[in-house]
Structure formats: C-alpha cells, structure tokens
Amino acid sequence: GVFEGRAIVFEGPEDYHDRINDPDLGIDEACFLVIRGVGPVGYPGSAEVVNMQPPDALLRRGVIELPTIGDGRQSGTSGSPSILNASPEAAVGGGLALLETGDRIRIDLNAGTANILISDEELSARRAAWSPPKLENQTPWQEIHRNTVGQLSTGGCLELATRYQRVGEIVPRNNH
C-alpha cells in the first residue's frame, strides 16, 4: 500500500508532550506524527520514546492511533502503525533532520520507501542550511557513547567494540 499524509514534527518526547494538544498544529486523521532527535546519538541509549498517541480532540472522536515515524525505538505496547529506527538519525543529519511540520510524506510499503514530497531544490536548500544540534553530555560516558556509537541500522553498537569481540582468546595480564 501507499500512504500519504502531512508531517507533524516533534523535537523529542518533551516537545511532543508540550505540543500534542496545540490546536494550531491542526492535527487530523491524515497526519503522521514524527519524533526526531531520539536515536543513539541524539538520545543516548535510544530510549523507547517514539510511542505517541493522537491529541485529545481526536481521541474523544474515537481516533485512537495515528501513524508514527521516529529515529528512535518504541515499546511493543504501542498500537500505532510505525516506522522506527530511521537511520541515519536526525542528530547526525539523516532525512528526518530536513523534515518540517506541514510537509507531505509518502510511504510506499511495497517499494520500502518513505519520501518527503518537496522539490529537489528545496531539499538541497534545507540540507545546505542544516547544522548539527548542540548536544550537551551529562556524563563522560554519554560523551564516549555519542562519539563512538553507530546508527540503529547497524545495531546502535559502539563502533570500536568490534575490535574486542575475541577477548577470551588472549590470556589477560596477571594483576597480582
């Protein structure tokens, strides 16, 4: 199937919770809820924060789910149709970084594609204007993580960890 809708973009779970019920967003049944900045670099550990429900006005009308897209993970308890683990994530310049609220999106399940419906010129202009977000680390471990983690498309693992896959083959130094 092919699906089209209008993107409503949130900059992480805090932004989603603050604005989901904002009537100025004009969220209706034809919208895709998008959350970005929640992948392994943007939200170390890539927490399960893509779970999103429609605004209260739609819930009262019986609309209990809208399609969601995110560069992070989601709990298995979410009933919404979802595209998760979008890679590369927005924090490193992936496609979701260029998406704006109001943009039209086309999802083609048969072709396995998700496309923003803007001109190539507009897409190029957005890419040229994009700059990485300033991410503040709360611990040295977050900094190490952000500087060495791969994307969810490759497992979200520390890239340097592949050098240590066979540590059991070498006898460690004696520490006594």
Feature roles, as predicted:
Residues 1-176:
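Feature captures the catalytic cores and cofactor-binding loops of soluble hydro-lyases/lyases
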